[in-house]
């Protein structure tokens, strides 16, 4: 029976179809939008069909593998495959990118290039999550940089060039460490160089080399995740980017770092991860508090939401460092949960700023009366972000808590201190989110302006918000919807660990 290369189709289709955008009429913005929307919807439908009919939930091994010889000299293969760890981020990518394309409807300047870059990002992200070859993983990682840089520098705010340059310097710097790690891991082997994930997973390294490789990969992933102190590109980037780009950055780009940390550092370098995991837990705990306090001091609405993202990433780092089934499943759930919530907050924040022509919170006030729909949606997603029970964030954070408490890796006193500090972080979250809502939506400040007529959200904004809100509620009520995808894979990853 001949096997159809579904994964190759899913990875290549967006960028291949995106190339034909340049043959569309230069002034036909409407045609470009609908064409891009059609590509994204078709891709999402193919993805859903393939995973529904070809993916087996109870199989922790790699499924739907595509393996083609690409460059003979390097023994370089186009090798793709998915398992319980990668299926969630791939579906999240498809969902958020489709909605980000709809969110980018108002973009009219150079719309052909704008939409092509979004589709190029789409291919790069899915390629990274489904890659089963170290060099292919690196190539897909790099494929992200140029589209994001151009989207920032051409369609950003006043300081777009500064933030785009800062983004490229940070991420390209991290990529150097990733390349060194990939080459070091690929070239070390008794039977010659190998880049195959399956071979690398069974490879044993001297402890010193393993720690060096782990540290190199950690720096690369810490920039993308981001982990403090390598996070300073994120608020500037989010503060200047168009809100559709912010949706892709917050919803998917940050998750690439977390995915890499689990896929490469945890799965392939288990001895080094066992040594580094206490430090990850400490850094994650500090990050929750630090980013929450910094967020509280931000005047810029987008920067406040950006720092809230950094704070929420702390839970993923703690879950990865907990070395428990519950903790790691909680980290993966938080990864997906924040993908939805972060994208929605940036979308609503961006549309609000576009309407009132302000970005500073202390200049806003009283928007809830002229814009009740935006107020309702923004409040709902803020509640989801502060982990209100019944929403996805609550289950994810609770699982990370339980994971660190039940971990056999740490002493009881250590666990109590970490849990207390995390609890303080959870108390700080509603403080900065509710103060943001108060400054934006309450009071009478904007009614004193001469032209104080604002348009509430239209059908497009309402549709995007509801589409994101439904999975947030669904995961909050029935988290097994997502956990069932990764639970067997998590069990397999953690079977390599021993406690020191």
UniProtKB/Swiss-Prot annotation:
Membrane topology summary: Multi-pass membrane protein
Enzyme type, top EC level: translocase
Cellular component annotations (GO), alphabetically ordered: chloroplast thylakoid membrane
Keyword terms: Chloroplast, Membrane, NAD, NADP, Plastid, Plastoquinone, Quinone, Thylakoid, Translocase, Transmembrane, Transmembrane helix
Major localization class: plastid
Segments crossing the lipid bilayer: 4-24, 35-55, 87-107, 113-130, 134-154, 167-187, 208-228, 242-262, 274-294, 305-325, 330-350, 386-406, 416-436, 463-483
Gene Ontology MF terms in the entry: NADH dehydrogenase (ubiquinone) activity; ubiquinone binding
UniProt similarity note: Belongs to the complex I subunit 4 family.
Record's protein name: NAD(P)H-quinone oxidoreductase chain 4, chloroplastic
Naturally occurring in which organism (per UniProt): Lemna minor
């Amino acid at each position: 029976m001949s096997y159809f290369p579904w994964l190759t189709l899913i990875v290549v289709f967006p960028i291949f179809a995106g190339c034909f955008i340049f043959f569309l009429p230069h002034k036909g913005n409407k045609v470009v939008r609908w064409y891009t929307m059609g590509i994204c919807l078709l891709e999402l439908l193919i993805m859903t069909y393939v995973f529904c009919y070809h993916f087996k939930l109870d199989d922790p091994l790699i499924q739907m593998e595509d393996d083609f010889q690409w460059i003979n000299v390097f023994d370089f293969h186009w090798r793709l495959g998915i398992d319980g760890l990668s299926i969630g981020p791939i579906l999240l990518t498809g969902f958020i990118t489709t909605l980000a394309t709809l969110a980018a409807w108002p973009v009219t300047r150079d719309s052909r290039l704008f939409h092509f870059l979004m589709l190029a990002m789409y291919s790069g992200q899915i390629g990274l999550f489904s890659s089963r070859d170290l060099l292919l993983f690196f190539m897909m990682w790099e494929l992200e940089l140029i589209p994001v840089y151009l989207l920032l520098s051409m369609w950003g705010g006043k300081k777009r060039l500064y933030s785009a340059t800062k983004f490229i310097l940070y991420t390209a710097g991290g990529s150097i460490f990733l390349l060194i790690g990939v080459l070091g891991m690929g070239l070390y082997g008794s039977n010659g160089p190998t880049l195959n994930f399956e071979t690398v997973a069974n490879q044993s390294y001297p402890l010193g080399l393993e720690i060096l490789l782990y540290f190199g990969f950690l720096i690369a992933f810490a920039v993308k995740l981001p982990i403090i102190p390598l996070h300073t590109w994120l608020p500037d980037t989010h503060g200047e980017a168009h809100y559709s780009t912010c949706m892709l950055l917050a919803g998917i780009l940050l998750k690439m770092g977390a995915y890499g940390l689990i896929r490469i550092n945890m799965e392939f370098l288990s001895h080094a991860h066992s040594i580094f995991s206490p430090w990850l837990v400490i850094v994650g705990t500090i990050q929750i508090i630090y980013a929450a306090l910094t967020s509280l001091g931000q005047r810029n609405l987008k920067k406040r939401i950006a720092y809230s993202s950094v704070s929420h990433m702390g839970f993923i780092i703690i879950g990865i460092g907990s070395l428990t089934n519950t903790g790691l499943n909680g980290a993966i759930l938080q990864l997906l949960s924040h993908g939805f919530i972060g994208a929605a907050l940036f979308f609503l924040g961006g549309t609000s700023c576009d309407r009132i022509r302000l970005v500073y919170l202390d200049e806003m006030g009283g928007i809830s009366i002229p814009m009740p729909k935006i107020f309702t949606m923004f409040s709902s997603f803020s509640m989801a972000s502060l982990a209100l029970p019944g929403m996805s964030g609550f289950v994810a954070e609770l699982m990370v808590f339980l994971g660190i408490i039940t971990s056999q890796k740490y002493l009881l006193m250590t666990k109590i201190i970490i849990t207390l500090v995390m609890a303080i972080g959870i108390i700080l979250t509603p403080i900065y989110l509710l103060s943001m809502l108060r400054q934006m939506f309450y009071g009478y400040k904007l009614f004193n302006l001469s032209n104080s007529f604002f348009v509430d959200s239209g059908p497009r904004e309402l549709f995007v918000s509801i589409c994101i809100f439904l999975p947030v509620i669904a995961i909050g009520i029935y988290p097994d919807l997502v956990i069932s995808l990764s639970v067997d894979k998590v069990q397999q990853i953690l079977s390599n660990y021993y406690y020191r």
